[in-house]
Every structure is written in structure tokens, then in C-alpha cells.
Amino acid sequence: MYLSHLTVADFRSYRWADLELTPGSTVLLGANGVGKTNLVEAIGYLGAQQSHRVSSDAQLVRFGRDRARIAGRVHRGSRTVALKVEILPGRSNRVAINRGASVRAKEGLGILRTVVFAPEDLSLVTGEPGGRRRLLDQLMVQLRPALGEAAADYERVLRQRNALLKSGRGSRRWGPEEDATLAVWDEHLCAAGARLLHGRLHVLRLLARPLQEMYAALTNGSKAAAYAYESTVPLARGTHAEVPAVADLATDMRRTLEAQREEERARALTLVGPHRDELALFLGPAPARGYASHGETWSLALALRMAAYDVLVADDPDPDARPVLILDDVFAELDAARRRRLAALVHRAEQVIVTAAALEDVPEELTAHRVLIRQDAEGSEAVAAAAPVEGDIREPRREGGADG
């Protein structure tokens, strides 16, 4: 698949931008700070309705506006789909397909599949566990969009359960009524948590071999990459040739919650569940976090994203379904050998979008099509322009000020 056109309005620093794209490789070229990353973030969001950079949609809307809009024309073989997403922080996104009426947001998932690698992905190796959990959950939803509801249900129930625990902290009012209410939330938490755990473990089982192969390809096989899932739910721990059943995971989670009841009351916090879990990464026998060199960290983070790409390709073997691959400011950080190896790995994608500040950083075979991104005299960002996507987003009238 590929994206032939992208239009954004009030997204990040962009008041309005319109970009024509082609199959094959495209380099978005421009100085640091002109908005290259904002454009590829918009492409990723159009497909997943999630940013690869931030967890809050509010940060995606241009300052002073109440919504942002992204539209694109997606091609999969002979089929073309016009997809539009309106980002409304604090509310559900509005999604339209082929200029039709708005549909449920989840119906827009899967039309455009993307895999994005960006410098922020170093935190997948060096950062806190939340980033690695997010990686698993994003891939899980791309594979099975319906599981997005399980993740949302889990977060909602977790907030309610924590609120109940906090309401009884240090209070003598905790009694049979509170116990009964907590038991109800336990059931909801275990039901949603078990589905989320099952989805994550399924993703990890699919990732294991591609992760090893991609890291070996990027580093010439210097060390073996591996993982272990460290869970507060004992049945979910380790690596799994077979994923435990949802019912078994729910039973084990319920049992563990009961064992932690007094500690949870004392701390007014839910201590058991997928929100507390960790994906531990290893290079050889050593944990990657804290032990990997800078080059190894880059290679492992890249291998994680490229392995995710392989998982999506295997999920739908139709060549026309291969995700769009986005490499955001990657090549400047790689030595010549790693650049060559990465360039050799991306050829399977029908479309590769690369951002760079200097063209010489990008392997020549990936520079077939170039788009210059700049800032005009007024400070607003400008890109190569073409006709809007089916008229979905029109350039707004200027309002007296330029955007930085």
C-alpha cells in the first residue's frame, strides 16, 4: 500500500499543508525544526489514530485551535480510499471514508498501516517500561483493531478501581459494602486485563524470531537479541511458545489481586495487572537497558520496529497490504555500515518515507523522490503542493499571523 496525498490542517505547527507522495522512496528534506517530523507523525496518526511521539492528542492540535484534521488518499492494489480523521481532544475522533458520513473511529483503523521509526524510539531500549508496553499495545491494535476497546476498557476500570482504593485510604469506613464494590471492579479489571495480556503475549510470540533476525542483520550477528515479559500476573511471565487462554489469565490475575488486597488498600493503588508489567530486552545475557552501547541501542530500537513491520507483513501476506515504512531522521545517527544494512532491509515496502536534514546522510537508493520542506518569509511551513484530497480539507484563510 501507499499514500499518494496528505493534507493537514491545524496539526502541530502546521496551519495547513498539502503534500503529494509517490510509491517507492521519498525523502522529506529540510533543516531541523521546519516540521518534517510533524508530517510523518500525521501520516502515522492517519493510520493508527495514535501518535508515536505523545500519548495526549491535545498536543497534536495547533495552539489556539480546538481540533486538527488529517486527510489522505490510500492505495492498496487497484483500490483507492480517501480517509479523513478529525482530532478532537477529550472526545472521540471523527472519521470519514470516501467522503461519506462520519463513521465510528475504529472503522478507520487498518485502512492505512504504517510503521514509524524515530529518534524517540531509543527510549524503547533506554526508557521506562511504559514506552515498551505502548509499543506492544500499538502493534496489538494494528493486528486486531477490536483489542483497542479492551485497552480502553482496562484504563477506564483501572481509574475507577484506584479511585475506590483512594477513597478508603486511612478511613475506618471500609467495610462489607466497599469490599463488595471492590469485588465488582476486580471482575471487570480481570476480564479486560486478561484480554490485554493475551493480546500482548500473542504479539510477543510473533515478534520473537523477527527481532532476532533483524538485530542480526543490522549488526552482522554480533550478539543475540531476546526478551522476557515480566508480569505481575505469574502465568504471563517469561516467553511463550503457546499463549495462555484468556480465561486462565483472568483466573490467575484474580488470584494475585486477592493475595495483594491488604497491600493495595495500604497504598491505595492497583498493584496487579498489565499496567505494571515490563518488557525486558536483552543483548546476549545482559539487559540492554543500562548495558548496551549507543550503537547497540540504535540497532535494537530499529530491530524492534523492523520486526513489527515483519509481523504486519506476515499477518496479511498480500503484497499490496505491506505497511508504509517511515524512517524519521534515522540515517544521520547510523554509521556507514548500518546505513547500508538498513537500506537493504527496507526494499520490501511499497512506500518508504525518509526525513533528513542533509541528503548525503540518506543512501542513494532511497532518494528517488525528494520533497523540500522549508519556512517561508512569514514563518509558516511550506511543502510541495498539489490538489487537496477530494476536497476534504481546504486551505483556510490567513488570519493575520504566521505560524512558527
Curated annotation (Swiss-Prot):
Signal sequence segment: none
Name recorded for this polypeptide: DNA replication and repair protein RecF
Residue ranges with Basic and acidic residues bias: 391-404
InterPro entries: DNA-binding_RecF, DNA-binding_RecF_CS, P-loop_NTPase, RecF/RecN/SMC_N, RecF_2
Organism (species): Micrococcus luteus (strain ATCC 4698 / DSM 20030 / JCM 1464 / CCM 169 / CCUG 5858 / IAM 1056 / NBRC 3333 / NCIMB 9278 / NCTC 2665 / VKM Ac-2230) (Micrococcus lysodeikticus)
Protein role: The RecF protein is involved in DNA metabolism; it is required for DNA replication and normal SOS inducibility. RecF binds preferentially to single-stranded, linear DNA. It also seems to bind ATP.
GO BP terms: DNA replication; DNA synthesis involved in DNA repair; double-strand break repair; SOS response
Gene Ontology molecular function terms on file: ATP binding; single-stranded DNA binding
Superkingdom as given in the UniProt entry: Bacteria
